[in-house]
Each structure stands twice: as structure tokens, then as C-alpha cells.
């Protein structure tokens, strides 16, 4: 599994085209562009053009160097004299896109995540758990080989907001071969990852999964031939409801070089997984170029991914799309500058609430890939989603117009309407969503079990609904955006003749309504 290089080489069989000294010059230009020294790259390109006026590859490299320097008009002028191949046309279109997006930047705030989480190597494929208690990355621990070695690292949050020094996961998760591009199930019991050059592999790189038994991960298990082929499979992303696995591959049928696919997941009695119904996401997402690094948000609707298509600024840019109720994906939208640049930008993911994103990009001195945190404007955020913890693990509830969400861990003492302290963390998250989404109003509906009279339970359920609403108001949400209802025991969701059933029936339900027309 090789991470993506800063630009597309026009001529692949370069050894057959150049003498040794020219190969060395090419590599020097390539290195200068990769490391951000585009001034020197431009100088060397011009020198070679004077020597070899009939060789278009130097002019193509010069056009790329101008693109990365930010001189888009010079790049277009340089490229316009070349034969208009697919790659030349794409690079010229990249210049037009880059010029437009840099002149109209989006409201992003980009922050380096520090030297503890980032290592001195290339840091790629960031992953944050839904509970935000572990940050995983893939680290290129040896990029001097023709096939760089990658391992999975992790870091923990500290009270001061920083992260602990990143450490490699132990064996058998990491080996002397390649492991990386990790994705975790919502309950934390499954990890998907990519391994390359394995004895049980089907091709160069395959998708694997591990199961967590207590505090120990099993050895990685190949996902099987339904997903993995003789080709390249990588960058898995599992949906929050554990029903679908998104991934990138160059397997057939494909639209372009690398496409994004999705497969259904089944869980067997012993916990092992099966996969079926592998589908290409189609040309709303995939192009004739490369699409990779999918990240499906917990809302189940919003997909982020990277592409080096004509709509990018050059290299890989992050795009997003949303699926409708009929299963159709919207046309992709470039996430804009400064999240995207003329360099490679990939491995994008978000936190649960969708107000922060994480991305791997070249650092400012051009030395290596590092992880950045990005504050996201509302226009590119996923749908508001809550993480609900219970004794069965983590579940996600998408906030949908008029659909009720029950939080079974909003707790009260028996026969009391005062909130327990342990209930407030969930309500804090709900209040945050309402503060960020001013078009959302909410109905707060109290429910009780059947113990007690009808009138008593109606009154108690109303008091509990009001108590919840008052707490949300105390967090800054306007009281005018809330309505309260007490349903008593009239709408049970479980039998009232057992303790377990009565616990389920004592609940607070939220129904959200958008004020947008």
C-alpha cells in the first residue's frame, strides 16, 4: 500500500527515454518539486528545455512546477504548447480550479496537530474513534525502499488538549510488511486494515479485519475473495451501523484507474465476517482518474474521499457527496481551499459531530506528510449525529426531521424529575448540535413505566421533559426552540411486567424539526 506521490509522471518508462545524466536531472527536479523547492525545479526545467526542445516531458514538468508554485497562468501558458493529451488537459484544468479556489477560500481553520501525534516520518490515514479517546495514524516508517513499509500508530488525549507521543501497535497487528489505513466499528470490536505482500493475500494489497477479544486483538483475517482480488484493494471505511464497507480498488468493473466500491457486511455466529454485493459507486463519484480514501460518516449519508480528477487543484483533493433516500449519490463537490492545496491531500475523516476534520498533507517545509486538524464550515459538514452509549455498546442516531430519538441514558432517580449528573454529558452534545444548527427546533417528550396512576405518570413525564429542556437552555439554547410533552405510560416500547422492560419505558424522546422551508 503505497501513499500517493505529489504528481503524475507523464512518461512511465523513463529509463528508455533518457541517458543516465538526464535521469539524474529528472530525479533532481522530481525531488525539488516533492520537497517544495519549486524555484530550483523551474530553473532546472528551463535549462533542460533549452537542451532538448523536442522533448515534451521537460515542458510538462515545468507546467507542474508552475502549478505548485502558484503561478497558474504560467503553467497554462507552458502546457498549451504541448500535444493536448488527457494528462495535459487535466493539468490545465487543475490550474483553472486552483486559481478559482485560492481566490475564493472557504472558511477553514487549519492547525498542525503537534510533534507528539506526528512522527518524523510520513504520517498518513488519520482515524479518530467516535468517543475521541484514541487517535490512530498510519506511519511510513521506511520510505527509502521501492515499496515503503507502513505501520499503525496510536496516540491518546491529555487533559491539556495535546496528544501523547504516538506509539506503534504491537504484533500481530504490525509486522515487517505493510499495515495501515485502519477503520473501526462503532462499538470498537472490529478493526479493518490493509496489509500488503502477505502469504494469505490475493494480490499486492488486501483488506483484512481483526476482532477484539477482551482487551486483545486477534490476528488479522483476510476479508476474502469477494472483496480482495489479484489487483489492489485498500483504504477501507466501515459504516456506523456495521452494514457496509467502503473501499478503493482497481478491480473490475471500474470507471477509472482506482475507484470506490461498497460491499455489504454479514456477521456469522462466531463473530467472523462475510461480505457480499460488491458494487462500484458509479460515475457520480468515480472518474477516469483515481478515487480513493473513502470515509463514510456516522450519519450513513455523507461520504468524503480523495480524487486527482480534473476538478482537483492538482494531486489529490478531498471531495464529498451525499446519498439520497433512493440510493443516488449527489455530484461530488471539491471541499475547497485551504483544506485542499495543489499538493496531495488525503486520508480525510471527521469527528462525530462533524465540526472538525483531520487530513494528511505535506508540511510547510516540504519535508514530510503530517496530520492537520481542520475546523469545518457548515456547508461541508455531515448531518448532525449523536453517539448513544449503552450496555450493548455504541450506537448512532442521525437527527432527521420529525423522527424521534430516545436517549436511554438520560436518567432520573425513581419517582424524581431531577436529572442525574451522569445524564448531562449526552445532553451537552445535543445542546452543542442545536447551537451549531440554529434551524433545528425540538420536541422533548417524557415517558414513564406503568407503575403509578395515569395522572401521576403524566405529570411526572412532563416534569422530566421540562427538567431536560431547562438543562439544555442552561447551555445557551433558546427556550423558544423547545416544546414539552408528557406521555406518561401511554407509549411503551417494551413490556411493563419486567424490570428490564420498565427501564426501557422510562425514557426521554427528542423530535427535531427544521425551520428551513
Predicted regions located by residue number:
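Short, conserved micro-motifs composed of acidic
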Residues: 23, 58-61, 68, 72-401, ...
Amino acid at each position: 500500500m503505497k501513499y500517493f506521490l505529489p504528481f503524475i509522471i507523464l512518461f512511465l518508462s523513463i529509463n528508455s527515454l533518457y541517458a543516465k545524466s538526464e535521469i539524474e536531472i529528472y530525479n533532481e527536479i522530481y525531488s525539488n518539486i516533492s520537497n517544495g523547492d519549486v524555484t530550483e525545479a523551474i530553473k532546472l526545467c528551463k535549462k533542460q528545455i533549452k537542451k532538448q526542445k523536442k522533448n515534451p516531458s521537460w515542458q510538462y514538468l515545468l507546467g507542474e512546477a508552475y502549478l505548485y508554485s502558484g503561478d497558474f497562468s504560467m503553467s497554462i501558458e507552458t502546457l498549451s504548447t504541448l500535444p493536448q493529451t488527457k494528462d495535459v488537459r487535466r493539468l490545465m484544468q487543475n490550474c483553472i480550479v486552483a486559481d478559482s479556489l485560492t481566490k475564493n477560500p472557504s472558511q477553514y481553520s487549519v492547525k498542525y496537530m503537534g510533534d507528539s501525534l506526528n512522527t518524523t516520518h510520513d504520517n498518513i490515514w488519520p482515524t479518530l474513534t467516535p468517543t475521541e479517546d484514541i487517535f490512530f495514524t498510519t506511519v511510513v516508517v521506511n520510505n527509502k525502499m521501492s515499496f515503503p513499509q507502513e505501520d499503525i500508530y496510536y496516540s491518546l488525549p491529555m487533559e491539556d488538549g495535546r496528544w501523547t507521543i504516538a506509539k506503534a501497535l504491537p504484533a500481530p497487528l504490525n509486522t515487517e510488511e505493510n499495515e495501515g489505513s485502519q477503520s473501526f466499528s462503532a462499538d470498537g470490536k472490529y478493526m479493518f486494515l490493509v496489509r500488503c505482500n502477505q502469504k494469505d493475500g490475493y494480490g499486492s494489497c488486501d483488506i483484512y479485519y481483526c476482532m477484539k477479544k477482551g482487551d486483545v486483538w486477534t490476528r488479522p483475517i483476510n476479508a476474502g475473495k469477494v472483496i480482495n482480488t489479484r489487483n489492489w484493494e485498500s483504504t477501507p471505511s466501515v459504516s456506523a451501523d456495521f452494514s457496509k464497507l467502503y473501499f478503493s480498488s482497481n478491480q473490475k468493473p471500474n470507471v477509472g484507474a482506482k475507484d470506490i466500491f461498497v460491499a455489504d457486511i454479514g456477521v456469522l455466529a462466531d463473530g467472523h465476517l462475510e461480505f457480499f454485493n460488491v458494487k462500484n459507486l458509479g460515475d457520480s463519484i468515480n472518474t477516469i482518474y483515481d478515487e480513493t480514501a473513502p470515509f463514510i460518516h456516522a450519519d450513513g449519508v455523507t461520504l468524503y474521499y480523495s480524487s486527482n480528477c480534473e476538478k482537483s487543484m492538482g494531486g489529490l483533493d478531498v471531495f464529498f457527496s451525499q446519498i439520497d433516500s433512493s440510493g443516488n449519490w449527489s455530484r461530488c463537490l471539491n471541499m475547497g481551499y485551504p483544506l485542499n492545496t495543489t499538493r496531495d491531500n488525503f486520508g480525510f475523516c471527521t469527528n462525530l459531530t462533524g465540526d472538525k476534520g483531520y487530513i494528511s498533507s505535506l508540511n510547510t517545509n516540504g519535508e514530510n506528510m503530517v496530520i492537520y486538524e481542520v475546523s469545518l464550515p457548515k456547508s461541508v459538514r455531515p448531518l448532525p449525529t449523536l453517539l448513544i452509549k449503552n450496555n450493548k455498546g455504541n450506537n448512532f442516531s442521525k437527527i432527521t426531521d420529525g423522527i424521534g430519538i430516545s436517549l436511554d441514558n438520560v436518567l432520573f432517580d425513581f419517582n424524581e424529575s431531577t436529572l442525574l449528573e451522569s445524564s448531562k454529558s449526552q445532553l451537552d452534545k445535543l445542546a452543542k448540535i442545536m447551537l451549531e444548527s440554529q434551524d433545528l427546533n425540538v420536541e422533548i417528550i417524557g415517558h414513564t413505566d406503568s407503575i403509578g396512576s395515569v395522572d401521576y405518570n403524566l405529570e411526572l413525564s412532563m416534569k422530566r421533559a421540562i427538567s431536560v429542556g431547562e438543562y439544555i437552555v442552561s447551555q445557551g439554547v433558546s427556550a423558544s426552540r423547545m416544546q414539552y410533552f408528557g406521555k406518561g405510560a401511554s407509549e411503551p416500547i417494551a413490556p411493563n411486567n419486567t424490570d428490564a422492560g420498565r427501564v426501557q419505558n422510562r425514557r426521554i424522546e427528542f423530535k427535531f424539526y427544521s425551520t428551513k422551508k
